[in-house]
A protein has these predicted regions:
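Elongated, amphipathic alpha-helical interaction scaffolds
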Residues: 1-131
Length: 131
């Protein structure tokens, strides 16, 4: 899944319930949330049924492990990698005519050069074969 870039040998499970920064803020509950020995964060979501705006939801979820890396005082803003992994039991509408399972890895890209702009934020979606 990580093209040899990750070799997760030790995992520390983190609190899967993320509360907003205000009393009335929306919370998020991840299916699995863990950190590897390098401090990189992994969110794993298993979604059984199609949900409108699932991509938006996964982007929203990724903001929690980013924000929790902030440190008070003198901080240089260096972030650890964040991976949001969606194991889906549905196919995104744009993939509905595919006859094979779809593995999609998404990173921030410069639209002019088509080069990866930022490699520490990764979204991985695994979709089943269309029925």
């Amino acid at each position: 899944m990580f093209h040899g870039e990750q070799n997760v040998q030790d995992v520390t499970y983190l609190n899967s319930e993320q509360l907003g920064d205000r009393v009335d803020a929306r919370r998020a509950i991840f299916d699995v949330y863990f950190e590897n020995d390098k401090g990189e964060k992994f969110i794993v979501e298993m979604q059984n049924v199609y949900q409108d705006f699932y991509k938006d939801r996964s982007i929203y979820y990724s903001t929690f492990p980013i924000a929790e890396q902030a440190q008070r005082g003198n901080w240089n803003y260096e972030l650890h990698d964040v991976y949001t992994i969606g194991i889906l039991n549905f196919t995104f509408p744009e993939d509905k005519h595919s006859d094979s399972s779809i593995f999609r890895e998404v990173k921030l890209m410069d639209t002019d050069s088509h080069e990866i702009f930022y490699d520490k934020l990764t979204y991985i979606y695994v979709e089943p074969v269309s029925k």
